[in-house]
Amino acid sequence: MGALLAFCLLVGLLRWGPAGAQQPGEYCHGWVDAQGNYHEGFQCPEDFDTQDATICCGSCALRYCCAAADARLEQGGCTNDRGELEHPGITAQPVYVPFLIVGSIFIAFIILGSLVAIYCCTCLRPKEPSQQPIRFSLRSYQTETLPMILTSTSLRAASRQSSTATSSSSTGGSVRRFSFARAEPSCLVPSSPPPYTTGHTIHLTQPSGFLVSPQYFAYPLQQEPPLPGKSCPDFSSS
């Protein structure tokens, strides 16, 4: 920042330094007065003038150096001068050295303030944490998805085994029910009737498919009392 300010000052000195040494003020061109006398031109300020008398003032017939800007003489409108004959390369161009110096300092301060503002806005602002880019790796994707695949496969195998066991148990139960259902009608059909006598026990054959304890099939028959007026034939002899 200090280097930039020094550079601006150096440029100003190189631009206006030699001009200030050669032409510190305006040049009053030579003129011819009313009597016809010619007066040579001079550079403002003259030896007897002050340092701020850098402006050519007066009239076309009488010219002198002064410091008042409102009294400046427009030498381009005068017709009684022979400036081109005296100095062919010099024209009547006003040079406002104080205004140029003040303007250059003002511009330098503006540039300096702008640089300070930019520095404060960019360097003193808290930096936000930069987000790292997400990198996709096939190896990490495989390592993440492989346990999930194995877990889902084991769950499917376990569910298949449980469903197979359930279906086999249901099939066995249905077969047992079917055999039990088919065995019941055979239980209702007894074998040949035993002799209707006392002291004999009835032994019913239990089918293989009927799952009932055998103690309910062997029991003695109680003797019924004879009916009055009726006689039962004895089938034991036959």
UniProtKB/Swiss-Prot annotation:
Membrane topology summary: Single-pass type I membrane protein
Cellular component, GO, one term: endoplasmic reticulum membrane
Disruption phenotype: Mutants exhibited no phenotype in either head development or somitogenesis.
Keywords: Developmental protein, Endoplasmic reticulum, Membrane, Signal, Transmembrane, Transmembrane helix
Biological processes annotated in GO: negative regulation of canonical Wnt signaling pathway
A Pfam cross-reference name: Shisa_N
Transmembrane segments: 99-119
Residues in compartment: Lumenal: 22-98
Ranges in the topological domain labelled Cytoplasmic: 120-238
Signal peptide: 1-21
Ubl conjugation as UniProt keyword: no
Places the protein is found: Endoplasmic reticulum membrane
Domain of life, source organism: Eukaryota
Assigned protein family: Belongs to the shisa family.
Purpose of the protein: Plays an essential role in the maturation of presomitic mesoderm cells by individual attenuation of both FGF and WNT signaling.
Descriptive protein name: Protein shisa-3 homolog
Organism: Mus musculus
Name of the gene this protein is made from: Shisa3
